[in-house]
């Protein structure tokens, strides 16, 4: 398949159409095709096409947001880490926030939908456990510039899509992925992070692919070794059977019953 031509066609349609929902579905479908054919592509090609598709999808999501009159794309609850009182807070577009703004000591509860978090320090991000609605068919999560935080998502509110974490340091990342679906996890520029990526159901046999790039001293919990495939795009000589000790390793560490505040106190 000529992914370059397909991506250019999506970019052309984005500049001409107002039917962003249909274009979003086509883009997600192309991402699925890329994942299916990834074994026949070089690491560079996979990374290049994946980045281009994600950029198109990000532009489509922005257009969808604008077309809805800047309605909120998701809702979460926010509280100071010193307070037990949750307050409903409408999302502000992180892309418009000044790059120097850093949020300190906040607790975010993800409830549904596409989500983006940026410039957090000594914060926690968890997913609600009492949500009774249906998960969306597709979506994306993005975390950027995260320092000394706990990301503990035991539920993700879409069935197919991607999680992208970049520029993350000294943090704890727990994810529960629906591995029976087309689901992409990408980690870029992570340093000294402890990571636990579990499957939605222990009965799911397929492995979850995790793409990493420019990562350093990251620890994946040893219990996840059998169901993860780590693809290091910074190391073209790495195979699925080996790990680059300077980038990542599988080791045991205390998961603190997956309790967010216990993790925060234990490691941060």
Swiss-Prot record:
Major localization class: cytoplasm
Keyword Ligase found: no
This protein's encoding gene: CIN2
Keywords: Chaperone, Cytoplasm, Cytoskeleton, Microtubule
Single Gene Ontology MF annotation: GTPase activator activity
GO cellular component, one term: microtubule
Purpose: Tubulin-folding protein; involved in the early step of the tubulin folding pathway.
Residue span, C-CAP/cofactor C-like domain: 98-255
Name of this chain's protein: Tubulin-specific chaperone C
Organism: Saccharomyces cerevisiae (strain ATCC 204508 / S288c) (Baker's yeast)
Remarks, miscellaneous: Present with 1630 molecules/cell.
Keyword Cytoplasm: yes
Subcellular location: Cytoplasm, Cytoskeleton
Domain of life: Eukaryota
One GO BP: post-chaperonin tubulin folding pathway
């Amino acid at each position: 398949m000529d992914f370059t031509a397909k991506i250019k066609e999506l970019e052309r349609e984005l500049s001409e159409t107002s039917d962003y929902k249909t274009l979003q579905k086509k883009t997600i479908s192309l991402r699925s095709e890329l994942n299916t054919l990834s074994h026949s592509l070089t690491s560079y090609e996979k990374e290049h096409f994946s980045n281009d598709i994600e950029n198109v999808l990000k532009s489509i999501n922005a257009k969808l947001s604008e077309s809805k009159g800047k309605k909120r794309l998701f809702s979460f609850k926010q509280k100071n880490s010193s307070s037990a009182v949750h307050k409903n807070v409408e999302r502000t577009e992180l892309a418009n926030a000044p790059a120097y703004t850093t949020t300190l000591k906040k607790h975010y509860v993800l409830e549904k939908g596409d989500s983006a978090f940026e410039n957090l320090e000594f914060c926690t991000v968890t997913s609600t456990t009492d949500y009774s609605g249906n998960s969306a068919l597709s979506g994306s999560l993005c975390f950027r510039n995260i320092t000394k935080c706990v990301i503990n998502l035991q539920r993700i509110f879409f069935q197919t899509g991607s999680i992208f974490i970049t520029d993350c340091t000294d943090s704890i990342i727990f994810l529960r992925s629906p591995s029976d679906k087309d689901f992409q996890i990408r980690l870029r520029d992570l340093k000294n992070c402890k990571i636990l990526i579990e499957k939605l159901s222990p009965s799911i046999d397929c492995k979850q692919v995790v793409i990493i790039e420019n990562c350093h001293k990251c620890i994946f919990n040893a219990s996840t070794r059998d169901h993860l495939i780590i693809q290091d795009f910074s190391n073209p000589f790495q195979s699925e059977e080996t790990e680059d000790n300077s980038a990542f390793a599988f080791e045991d560490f205390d998961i603190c019953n997956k309790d967010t505040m216990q993790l925060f106190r234990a490691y941060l």
